[in-house]
Each structure stands twice: as C-alpha cells, then as structure tokens.
Regions:
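Phosphate-handling DNA/RNA-contact segment within nucleic-acid enzymes
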Residues: 1-67, 71, 84-85
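Generic hydrophobic alpha-helical scaffold/packing signal
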Residues: 19, 65, 89, 111, ...
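Alpha-helical interaction elements
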Residues: 34-35, 45, 96, 102-104
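Acidic, metal-coordinating catalytic cores used for nucleic-acid/nucleotide bond scission
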Residues: 35, 56, 75-85, 103, ...
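Flexible glycine/proline-rich, aromatic-decorated loop/lid segments
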Residues: 61-64, 90, 128-132
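Short, hinge-like loop/turn segments at secondary-structure boundaries
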Residues: 67-68, 89-91, 116-123
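Conserved acidic, small-residue-rich alpha-beta core segments centered on
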Residues: 84-95
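C-terminal or mid-to-C-terminal helical accessory/interaction module adjacent to the motor/catalytic core
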Residues: 98-171
Length: 172
C-alpha cells in the first residue's frame, strides 16, 4: 500500500542489489514484478529491476539513467504487458536513453519462462530476442493492420511519434 513513506512510483525493486551489475554490463533489464527480479537474479541475471507492478514513471527512468543509458524491457507476453511496453518505450526514449524490448511467448513472463529453460538457454533467449523499438512496434502494429492502408498509415505515424520524442537530433 502507498503511504508517505513508501510510494511505489518512486521505487525500483532490486535497484540496490542490481546497480553494480547495471554499471558493469551498461544495461538494465526492466521487468514488471518482484518475482521476475528474484527469478532473474537466481538465474545470475543480476542487472534486473522491477517497476513494482506500476506503470513506469519518469522518476524510475531517471534512477536507471544514473547507472546506464541502455534499458531492455522484459514485460509479460500478454496484451497488458505489450501495452505497458508501448507506453514505456516512448518515456524511455524521451529521457534520452536507448531501449530494446523482449517479448515472451503468449502467457509467459520472465519468471515463468526462466523456469522452463536452463540459465544458459534463457540468457540466449534474451540476447536473440531483443528488438529495437522500431522493430518491436512495427512487428506488433503491422500484425494488427492486416495490410489495411489506413491502419498502416497509423502504424507509421506511431513509429514517427516515438522517434520524434528522442531529444538528441543526431540519434533521432
């Protein structure tokens, strides 16, 4: 529960334990929940933090930015996780950070999927399935458009909007 002492939107679960690994790897894996952090740490993926089941906030992004400019979103493979990834991508980009996204199979999350694979196979899955934000959005949005020109146009506009929030003109 929220209180004057504890405000979930101001906390990244596991940050204290992960900060040295985030610096060492120059990358932060961002998950949704506590159990995801615990499972990934158990699998020796220690540069992992959670947004504590809340929508990602600018304050949380600033906390990560102190240690790395690279974030990989590992949200759940359900529609809610995909929607949260869409929202998070633009916020991370507008803070000037680099972002990639890993989508898990339908019905899986980092915790459940890490239990189905060996540690090495799970690490390989994370490496091989990281998509930059343009590829992530294009693949998902184009599946929805079904080659309808109006929907394709909306997809392109969505991607352009994401690019436009990048503060650095050269990166944009």
């Amino acid at each position: 529960p929220e209180s004057e002492i504890y405000n979930k939107s101001q906390v990244l679960y596991g940050l204290y334990q992960a900060k040295n690994e985030i610096i060492k790897n120059d990358c932060c894996f961002l998950v949704e929940g506590y159990t995801d952090v615990i499972s990934l740490h158990h699998n020796n993926i220690k540069n992992t933090v959670a947004s504590s089941g809340t929508s990602l906030t600018e304050g949380q992004i600033r906390m990560i930015k102190r240690f790395s400019n690279n974030i990989v979103i590992l949200y759940d493979g359900d529609q809610a996780g995909i929607n949260a990834s869409f929202r998070g991508v633009d916020m991370i980009l507008s803070a000037g950070l680099n972002v990639k996204v890993v989508i898990f199979p339908e019905g899986e999350d980092p915790d459940s999927y890490s239990h189905k694979l060996s540690t090495e196979d799970f690490k390989s899955y994370l490496e091989e399935n990281q998509n930059d934000f343009i590829t992530f959005k294009a693949n998902l949005l184009l599946k929805k458009t079904k080659n309808d020109p109006i929907n394709v146009s909306k997809t392109i506009n969505d991607i352009i909007t994401s690019i436009s929030v990048i503060p650095d003109a050269v990166s944009r």
